[in-house]
């Protein structure tokens, strides 16, 4: 009975800030952590287990110590996950395995696109032109601009 009383006495925090991201405190830990860019469900579960937190617990009801443990595990991501789980293996510039999260995801994506454009690779040229990059057909789909109507022969002859 005492555990239920202590659980109900813990106040729910609706927003929990981890890794410069506001996370929903009403969700389970493993689902709430997916709100951080670069963290999927599998990695979120790994973070929770490494921090000693129940992945199915509600994030907003966790005590401050467990949230700090989660923050520490996320900050030291290179030490806590194997290289095959990282989203940026053998980085183009540095050659180091790393995991990119948060605002870094957009920055590195933009840098990669700029490198492709500067080297004039096929993908870079397609990105510059705003066309499909991954081999999709473009004959009839992916058109942009105003639609051009077809004029009938009778009206065309009068003009």
From Swiss-Prot:
GO CC terms: cytosol; small ribosomal subunit
GO biological process: translation
Family: Belongs to the universal ribosomal protein uS13 family.
Assembly and binders: Part of the 30S ribosomal subunit. Forms a loose heterodimer with protein S19. Forms two bridges to the 50S subunit in the 70S ribosome.
UniProt-annotated stretches for the region Disordered: 136-159
Record-linked HAMAP family: Ribosomal_uS13
A single GO molecular function term of this UniProt record: rRNA binding
One Pfam family hit: Ribosomal_S13
Protein name: Small ribosomal subunit protein uS13
Organism: Methanothrix thermoacetophila (strain DSM 6194 / JCM 14653 / NBRC 101360 / PT) (Methanosaeta thermophila)
Comp. bias (Low complexity): 138-149
Keywords: Ribonucleoprotein, Ribosomal protein, RNA-binding, rRNA-binding
Function (record text): Located at the top of the head of the 30S subunit, it contacts several helices of the 16S rRNA. In the 70S ribosome it contacts the 23S rRNA (bridge B1a) and protein L5 of the 50S subunit (bridge B1b), connecting the 2 subunits; these bridges are implicated in subunit movement.
